[in-house]
Amino acid sequence: NDILKLIEDYPLKLDIEYNINMKAMHDIKKPLVELNEMIGMRKLKDSIIDQVIFFSQDLHKDNDFMHTVIYGPPGTGKTEIAKIMGKIFSSIGVLKNNKFRKVTRADLIAGYLGQTAIKTRDVISDCLGGVLFIDEAYALGNREKRDSFAKECIDTLCEGLSDHKDKLMVIIAGYEDDLNKCFFSYNQGLNSRFPWRFHTDDYKAAELNLIFQKKV
């Protein structure tokens, strides 16, 4: 709300020199309205705004990662949030396009060793310039770590996170404990490549009622 009020109070004028990147603020007005209109999740929204300000006001460096984790159970709006984040980052020019692709284990892992790396790289290449969203990313691996296909996929993904850090935003979602044990534990380099971690809030009864009314 504060950012939207700032945009309303200060129309963009080319003959005025602002202390902040006001053009970036105006460019993200539409997706910010979408984010604001989502029911509940106040803490999550505030965290996303911190990330947006960091990148939109050029506070980041070339070696900073955009990759993000959204913790939470199914049905808490993680996919919609990821789409809005893609719109925001493409609007400010950090991402080159508004491409958004949601994938699961079946989209990344093949039936034979060696093919999984190729399949994963193809998905990464297809998403360059936009957002790759891996829902339930913990399903890529398992707690026992006996799946060699999972290791091949996750290692290839980890490589792509660095090689294309300025061209790609990877967002993964799922339960925190499962992601830690079935995804991050496969490769020690993964944790540092996902500096942004958000948690979805549990909906309150009144919020669930509003969601129901909105759908009706």
Give the residues covered by each predicted segment.
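A short helix-turn-beta junction within AAA+ P-loop NTPase domains corresponding to the substrate/partner-engaging
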Residues: 183-202
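Conserved AAA+ ATPase "sensor/coupling" helix adjacent to the nucleotide-binding pocket
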Residues: 186-188, 209-216
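Substrate-engagement module of ASCE P-loop NTPases
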Residues: 124-126, 153-168
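Short glycine-rich substrate-engagement loop in P-loop NTPases that contacts/grips substrate
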Residues: 97-127
